[in-house]
């Protein structure tokens, strides 16, 4: 049952994290009459601008997080980022609070160690070789055992922060320092992974719903500096590789439990598929689904967490997204060239309305459909390039 916002019978959902992905989730929740409460570490975050009300707290502060949940008494608590006091969510779930998809899933996926050990050691899924390191001495030993090239990431980071590829052992100290600076909680534990010379990488959006497990068409993407720049759907792959990908994604999602959409990241090399990471929430590469599917990843996530069925997912055809990236310092961001960016048929824009910028930041995305993937990517890139960010 869903009531009406601001009434006694309202169904209340609290978003922990109010960025561009949370904003789309908030919109989809409101389309189904859910009262939305946004929570983030800074004011006027994108999802706060469309939520019914909002709170600014340090979400790594266990007491502050507990206090806001106890104040609002939401029926659903929906983590949309990793930087949260997850043990508080575990404790509150045990007290009866409904954490989406589960507090365990949120805690396991908050850091790379929890989910990598679940995938490789518990589920026996194929992954790259890896070591976890607390000191630079352990780090150097791991590199010598794995060899170069190898990938270094803080166990707690996002958007490529602190991530690098070591191709020369002489650069290992620099990579260690960069990883220490890039972690969400400051310096700390890192993972050193063997580099898989993959043919391509995909995000397989996997939905656990009341009527079973569902998959979106695979999404291909290009990364730069550890963050996505373009994504496209569908990624071409054989039926055999798709079946292997879906089998891996199903195992991970079923092990994490709960209802919702999961972004499962996989590497493909020939006929082999390797597990990389998973997010128990919509994925940034999945922004392409805003134009590629009848139900976007955000709509699917909301249906699943509300316990609603997903009869089918229709993919419209070759589609792409291209990031609108800017670099600078401003609290008065403006955009020009929007009309030019939307001149071509089957193009759309999403401007995230982030309140400020200090350094490099993703501020929007261009979306496009065309006759094939290459054309769709080219059209999305062209559209994105026409948007000029003014400070």
Swiss-Prot record:
The gene is purT. Homodimer. Mg(2+) binds at residues 265, 277. Keywords: ATP-binding, Ligase, Magnesium, Metal-binding, Nucleotide-binding, Purine biosynthesis. Residues 117-306 form the ATP-grasp domain. It is an enzyme of class 6 (ligase). It comes from Shewanella baltica (strain OS155 / ATCC BAA-1091). This is Formate-dependent phosphoribosylglycinamide formyltransferase. ATP binds at residues 112, 153, 158-163, 193-196, 201. InterPro entries: ATP-grasp (IPR011761), ATP-grasp_carboxylate-amine (IPR003135), ATP_grasp_subdomain_1 (IPR013815), PreATP-grasp_dom_sf (IPR016185), PurT (IPR005862), PurT/PurK_preATP-grasp (IPR054350), PurT_C (IPR048740), Rudment_hybrid_motif (IPR011054). GO terms for cellular component: cytosol. GO terms for biological process: 'de novo' IMP biosynthetic process. Involved in the de novo purine biosynthesis. Catalyzes the transfer of formate to 5-phospho-ribosyl-glycinamide (GAR), producing 5-phospho-ribosyl-N-formylglycinamide (FGAR). Formate is provided by PurU via hydrolysis of 10-formyl-tetrahydrofolate. GO terms for molecular function: ATP binding; magnesium ion binding; phosphoribosylglycinamide formyltransferase 2 activity; phosphoribosylglycinamide formyltransferase activity. The keyword Metal-binding applies. It comes from the Bacteria. Belongs to the PurK/PurT family. NCBIfam families: PRK09288.1 (NF006766), purT (TIGR01142). Its EC number is 6.3.1.21. Transmembrane segments: none annotated. It catalyses: N(1)-(5-phospho-beta-D-ribosyl)glycinamide + formate + ATP = N(2)-formyl-N(1)-(5-phospho-beta-D-ribosyl)glycinamide + ADP + phosphate + H(+). N(1)-(5-phospho-beta-D-ribosyl)glycinamide binds at residues 20-21, 80, 284, 354, 361-362. Pathway: Purine metabolism; IMP biosynthesis via de novo pathway; N(2)-formyl-N(1)-(5-phospho-D-ribosyl)glycinamide from N(1)-(5-phospho-D-ribosyl)glycinamide (formate route): step 1/1.
